[in-house]
Swiss-Prot record:
One of its GO terms (molecular function) is DNA binding. Part of the relaxosome, a complex composed of plasmid encoded TraI, TraM, TraY and host-encoded IHF bound to the F plasmid origin of transfer (oriT). Interacts with TraM, probably through its C-terminus. It is found in: Cytoplasm. Keywords: Activator, Conjugation, Cytoplasm, DNA-binding, Plasmid, Transcription, Transcription regulation. GO terms for cellular component: cytoplasm. InterPro entries: TraY. It comes from Escherichia coli. Belongs to the TraY family. This is Relaxosome protein TraY. NCBIfam families: PRK13740.1-1. Conjugative DNA transfer (CDT) is the unidirectional transfer of ssDNA plasmid from a donor to a recipient cell. It is the central mechanism by which antibiotic resistance and virulence factors are propagated in bacterial populations. Part of the relaxosome, which facilitates a site- and strand-specific cut in the origin of transfer by TraI, at the nic site. Relaxosome formation requires binding of IHF and TraY to the oriT region, which then facilitates binding of TraI. Also positively regulates tra gene expression. Its main location: cytoplasm.
Length: 71
């Protein structure tokens, strides 16, 4: 897999590989809500993106990078 290259995704599907702890938490949430695992992930991801629309604020990242001294 090459890093640093981006291209437009051909569709709107995503493959996730979860660690066992995260998977177990997701399964427990699915069981509590009565939704499918896919719908649970969709709702949680959508909620996160609505709550944190600019998680990586580009101006803050730039300021942090400028404040680092060369070693």
């Amino acid at each position: 897999m090459s890093r640093g290259r981006t291209r437009a995704a051909p569709g709107n599907k995503v493959l996730l590989i979860l660690d066992e702890t995260t998977n177990q938490k997701l399964l427990a949430a699915r069981d509590r809500s009565g939704r499918t695992k896919t719908n649970e992930v969709f709702i949680r991801l959508k909620d996160h993106l609505n709550r944190f629309p600019d998680f990586y604020n580009s101006s803050l990242v730039k300021e942090e990078a400028e404040g680092i001294d060369d070693i």
